[in-house]
Amino acid sequence: RVCVDVVGGDEKPQVVLDGIEAALAADPDIEVLAAGPAEIVNPFAASHARVEALEAPDVIAMDDDPIRAVMTKRKSSIVLSCRAIKKGNADAFFSAGSTGAMTAAATAYVTPFRYQAEGKKQPVRPCLTNALPNRAGGLTVLCDMGANPDVEVDDMVRFAQMGSAYARVVLGIEHPRVGLLANGTEDEKGSNFTKACFPAMKAAVPGFVGNCEGTDLTSGNFDVVVADGMSGNIALKATEGAAKFLLQEL
């Protein structure tokens, strides 16, 4: 059962509603919890057998402060959807809305993964992940793509572990090859931070190959590329920009 934010994205709600209909047609087992204003979700749910309405009168705008919006707009589609997962009323949540609000709401309302460190269980910070097509005909997982501009070494290790799990479970890659984004492939390359991450990832991440460069997002030499949110977002946007330029020129 998937909860969908119908007021997220630039062309809401019609594009989102069209997407829900396409998903229902493609998968007879899927059920949808449509979250949004009553005047949108109630008639839509009434006309679709596998759709239930989740009335959410508040709307988090793209330019809202993410943390403040999550704490004050408690009846927004993003917050109520995350709470639906927490309560077991949904298995997954999709939104094309505010990335920051999604991250903040997931952290606040969905029980995070935890790991043992310094004698207590620490929450794992969420990271943004996507799978990019590569020249070998497969996909390369990039994480983090922008959720966490400032991170610690332990965070990078967890990102690598989560990225590897995603590559195995979702992409079916039995032994993912993991790379650390740096300014060169040599072990000694990188900033002081990436140099600190290197031995930690080598010790804790099976399949860790070593440093990789921005070109390895599409080279096919790595299945998972790990970066802090700032570097990962820059690498992603640079790749997108280059692709758009080439398509325009060809």
Stretches found by the model and what they are:
Residues R1-R68, R74, R83, K87, ...:
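Anion-binding alpha/beta catalytic cores of soluble intermediary-metabolism enzymes, centered on
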Residues F222:
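Conserved beta-loop-beta/alpha segment of the NTase-like Rossmann-fold superfamily
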